[in-house]
């Protein structure tokens, strides 16, 4: 069970500090910052190449979803062994790219928020194909097991795209407006977070149907807010952050029992996972601080600081 976009962590960490227009590198053992790269714009999320030697980062532009300032049209290409900016891919139009994933064929997929689309990019030629999804795409996940891409469009449904045909084929209706989404390592289960409810929705990726609704205990269901979700690479845990509540919750993936929750610093966003399988990371965007915490208990083990606006973190081995 291996997900190209959610591999076990490595001895190195890379973190986006989007407000500062920087990317940081850290030693995962010591949490010492080992390098910083200046980015050409506000770089939000990253996807790694199959060989783990390249990171692709979406340059969304400044501001936040809907309240964009100078929306961008680029994807940065970072060489991980040399920790250098190798080049920049121009998407051909101002799309405000955000969520980004790599498929098994080597195609890079990203959201094209301003184009109501997802984009399929060939990193070898920089050719870009636009696939209309009928709404402001913000995040996506790839299920190689089913040959589908699932797309969050900040509505009360998730769009489904055929990976090979590169066209939208379905929409999965949900009880509330949703935003954050994640996928199990085997590609069989999609997890989606309610934006207008403190709920986690569990979708069967093959049947394209809602299977279960899980309450997020300790989160405020009356606030409309961004929630993000990730599944641990070993498929043991599901973690959820609630951005305005400064709250994180941990669920057992088997049965989805909530086993822990903890308070965070301001504006928790993206999760990453440590190589030991016992710890995870959480970026607290507004306080520019990353938590390392125990997955089994939620206990905070260590913290470290970044430049302004940490959003995304991933471990790697190159």
Predicted regions and their residues:
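Predominantly soluble domains enriched in secretory-pathway, periplasmic, or organellar proteins
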Residues: 1-318
